[in-house]
From Swiss-Prot:
Source species of the chain: Helicobacter hepaticus (strain ATCC 51449 / 3B1)
Lipidation (N-palmitoyl cysteine): 27
Predominant place of localization: membrane
Entry's family note: Belongs to the UPF0323 family.
S-diacylglycerol cysteine: lipidated positions: 27
Protein name as annotated: UPF0323 lipoprotein HH_0014
GO annotations of cellular component type: plasma membrane
Lipoprotein as UniProt keyword: yes
Keyword Transferase: no
Signal peptide interval: 1-26
Membrane topology value: Lipid-anchor
Length: 208
């Protein structure tokens, strides 16, 4: 519980990242639990995300925890337990590298065997990826392998459920305001928010 409290405190800290909010074009959804978190994230308009990605002993990465936040930030926890916030430039470069892997069919996000994720893949698998990587969202959300593997990208089923519940609660709290909005709900596609995508995308220079 102390660890969870610490994470929530991080999520309240002022930002390093730049949040962009996007709308999602309606797309066909498969049934089953693995779609539940994706649906929740897509409908969490006006919420950023604070995400902790943890390095595993084999060098792969999983989503450890994530919470709604006013701004979108990603914290990396390495296998030695050291934590640091990733810069926006690092995040942008990692997402760009993972996009290349997706386009070439080499990304574990869309691999039917669902192997271990690299850091960029873990970021895209998280709520932060749904926001910051929204410009490649259709490549993932319309991919059946990504849908099937979504839960295993988290450290545990409990982490997956905590994320789903956190973003559901945030969505419920914001429902009153959303009724007055003419925009579509969700992260991807449409509306003025798409302008924020090109404004906020940086070209980071971090190596892989």
């Amino acid at each position: 519980m102390k660890h969870i409290h610490k994470i929530k405190n991080y999520a309240m800290v002022g930002g390093l990242g730049v949040m962009a909010v996007f709308a999602l074009n309606a797309c066909e959804q498969n049934s089953g639990q693995n779609n539940a978190l994706n649906n929740t994230l897509q409908n969490s308009q006006k919420n950023g995300a604070f995400v902790i990605v943890e390095e595993q002993n084999d060098g792969s990465y999983k989503v450890l925890e994530e919470y709604p936040s006013e701004q979108t930030r990603v914290m990396l926890k390495d296998k030695n337990g050291q934590e640091r916030l990733l810069s926006q430039e690092e995040i942008d470069e990692l997402i760009k590298q993972e996009e290349v892997a997706i386009d070439s069919g080499q990304s574990q996000l869309t691999n039917p065997n669902g192997g271990g994720l690299g850091l960029g893949g873990a970021i895209l698998a998280s709520a932060a990826g749904a926001i910051l990587g929204s410009y490649i969202g259709n490549k993932l959300f319309n991919n059946p392998n990504y849908q099937a593997n979504s839960q295993r990208n988290y450290k545990s089923p409990q982490a997956y459920e905590r994320s789903k519940n956190s973003f559901n609660s945030a969505k419920t709290g914001a429902s009153g305001a959303s009724k007055t909005s003419s925009g579509k709900s969700g992260f991807f596609g449409g509306g003025n928010s798409s302008q924020s995508t090109s404004t906020n995308r940086n070209t980071g220079s971090m190596g892989s």
